[in-house]
Amino acid sequence: MPNTKPVVDNPDVVNYVHNKAKTVGAANVLQVGAVTKGQQGKELSNIEGMVKAGIPAISEDGKSVMNAQLYREAMELAAKYNIAVLAHCEDINLVNGGVMNADVNARELGLGGITNSVEDIIIARDIMLSRDTGARLHLCHCSTKDSVSMVKHAKMEGIHVTAEVCPHHFTLTSDDIRKIEPTVDTEKKVAIEADADTNYKMNPPLRTKEDVQALKEGLRDDVMDVIATDHAPHTFEDKNTSMKSAPFGIVGLETAACLTYTELVLGGYLTPMQMAEKMSYNPAKIIGIDKGDIEPGKVADIVIFDPDETYVIDKNTFFSKGRNTPFDGRKVTGKVRMTLVNGQVVYEDKEK
């Protein structure tokens, strides 16, 4: 994604990332370009130049372009060059300091809530812009029941829209957020207010049981096309603060496969092949690359997954520098045993 320092909003930065990735060789990196310069939402980035440098998509990652006319122009360029538009859907004007789902849990903690409409309003707008421009729209990390409904109806109308769901959004609800009871710091002689575990703070936030059920059914019915990680690592220091102050985001990469298998395959919503399709073939198809399936002559980017092992997630074993997960200590089934990139083993589980 382009939300780096510097922001990926021109071909020079795209080329730098691609060259760096080739040097490291641990994964095939496809760099997405920013929609606007500096992700400031005021002026379009050099989309044409970045397309020539090889970007498969544009995104304002982590925010929405609130200027609808500017976003329309970006979509027109995306349609012209046949690249995808990856949309984070959030009406920032409605967030109003919210840090978790707007429900009884937020009220009990005295925290600002984020309503479903924050997401749903922008989803509706972006679908309409996709309809008007012909751009290929992909909705990132959908979390609401109405997102599933809108995607379903858009597809029925022939609009070029696809959508993804993240494991935390189909596994947890706002009721699962670990609450921290109010205490008194006897050394500092101050009262510590009730709060919540910041490892449950992500954007979009965890929603309700009704939303979770709709997302699962949307994946089952192929309304929702992709299972994505929304991997957002943060340091312990970043997260070791209040729910109001902590950054949004959790690590998602190392728990995505096991949570998907446990919740959706063993839960009866997906077959193993559907899981593989939504985590590999469909994403590749959406961004227009010839990957995601195993055939003679294809590039061997392969994950070897063991569906039989049951274990407890231990954040201290993560390869990511981030340990900010709400799933530490959770019992799951299914484990990644090996990863190959271009036919070369880049990861191997040494335990077996």
PLM regions and their residue ranges:
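Active-site beta->alpha loop and helix N-cap motifs at the rims of alpha/beta catalytic domains
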Residues: 34-40
